[in-house]
Regions:
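An acidic, glycine-rich, mixed-charge low-complexity segment common to nucleic-acid enzymes
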Residues: 1-2
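Short, compact, well-ordered microdomains
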Residues: 83-132
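Compact soluble domain cores
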Residues: 10-90
């Protein structure tokens, strides 16, 4: 029969393993290599950086923001849970956030298990810090 401290160590090991797997999948999401993921930008983000007279500016802005999200390097301060699901960056002098959320495959509810791709679709949202 395991003791309380042994159970705590087991729970901690499971939590670390879950966080590592989430981090791995989130890295794939950020890099655009995860089929079960999509990236969206908020309306405020698009309005702040796109030229309404130039429809092609939307693609240029989306590409620039995605490149910054992909290039994000984590430090201990911005990844407290080890899942690499949130970041902060600047674009054209404005502070932005990106956040990965875990949904069920219908995108209606939260995922039961973010480490199981058969149960989880990721949505990476890019937004102005002021929209958070």
């Amino acid at each position: 029969q395991p003791t309380g401290s042994e159970l705590d160590e087991e729970d901690e090991a499971v939590g670390i393993g879950r966080a590592r797997e989430c981090a791995r999948l989130n890295d794939l999401c950020r890099s655009g290599q995860l089929h079960e993921a999509r990236t969206v930008s908020t309306r405020g983000c698009i309005d702040a950086f796109c030229d309404p007279e130039d429809p092609m500016s939307l693609f240029a802005v989306q590409a620039a923001l995605a490149a910054k999200v992909r290039a994000h390097e984590f430090n201990g301060d911005d990844d407290p849970h080890g899942e690499r699901d949130f970041g902060v960056f600047e674009h054209q002098g404005q502070k932005l956030f990106w956040k990965i959320d875990y949904y069920d495959p219908t995108l209606s509810f939260g995922s039961e298990d973010p480490t199981d791709l058969s149960k989880t679709h990721r949505v990476l949202t890019i937004l102005l810090a002021s929209e958070y």
